[in-house]
Amino acid sequence: MLSGLQNPRQAAAQLMNFALILSTAFMMWKGLSVATDSPSPIVVVLSGSMEPAFQRGDLLLLWNRNMWQETAVGEIVVYNVKGKDIPIVHRVVRKFGTGDKAKLLTKGDNNNADDTDLYARGQDYLERKDIIGSVVAYFPFVGYVTILLSEHPWLKTVMLGIMGLLVVIQRE
């Protein structure tokens, strides 16, 4: 089964193929980031705070269109909070001002209160720089794999093991 790896050229070719796949995925991610003007053009809904609009596990496509058009009340945005690593998907419920100086207040559709408790200490509203992007499309439950991998770390090990085994036994 592993006799094909005795040839160093075959092993090097498989390693190069694996590196090519990884670099292609990275370039596609960076290209999508540039095209959407968003550092994270794809996010997964991690909680039920936006139900019924989005369910936990939905995959969202973002576009930072606010360079051409201002964020409007009712728009669903993804934003970062200073000091927290996880982006939040919520709807804009109030807007004060225009342009880069606009102040935005957000709230999850399934939440009773607005997001002021989620914002950084001393921050009452979001600013333009806090917005990662606006939701332009979604794929239901496609991102649930990400949630499973984060909630069950042993699944990562199993998946990486299977992928590694496939690389080793693959024959050209």
From Swiss-Prot:
One of its GO terms (cellular component) is signal peptidase complex. Pfam families: Peptidase_S24. InterPro entries: LexA/Signal_pep-like_sf (IPR036286), Pept_S26A_signal_pept_1_Ser-AS (IPR019756), Peptidase_S24_S26A/B/C (IPR015927), Peptidase_S26 (IPR019533), Peptidase_S26B (IPR001733). It is a single-pass type II membrane protein. The chain crosses the membrane at residues 15-35. It comes from the Eukaryota. Keywords: Endoplasmic reticulum, Hydrolase, Membrane, Protease, Signal-anchor, Transmembrane, Transmembrane helix. Residues 36-172 are lumenal. One of its GO terms (molecular function) is serine-type endopeptidase activity. Residues 1-14 are cytoplasmic. Its EC number is 3.4.21.89. GO terms for biological process: protein targeting to ER; signal peptide processing. SUPFAM superfamilies: LexA/Signal peptidase. The keyword Hydrolase applies. Residues 158-169 are annotated as: C-terminal short (CTS) helix. It is an enzyme of class 3 (hydrolase). The active site is at 49 (charge relay system), 90 (charge relay system), 115 (charge relay system). The C-terminal short (CTS) helix is essential for catalytic activity. It may be accommodated as a transmembrane helix in the thinned membrane environment of the complex, similarly to the signal peptide in the complex substrates. Catalytic component of the signal peptidase complex (SPC) which catalyzes the cleavage of N-terminal signal sequences from nascent proteins as they are translocated into the lumen of the endoplasmic reticulum. Specifically cleaves N-terminal signal peptides that contain a hydrophobic alpha-helix (h-region) shorter than 18-20 amino acids. Belongs to the peptidase S26B family. This is Signal peptidase complex catalytic subunit SEC11. It comes from Metarhizium acridum (strain CQMa 102).
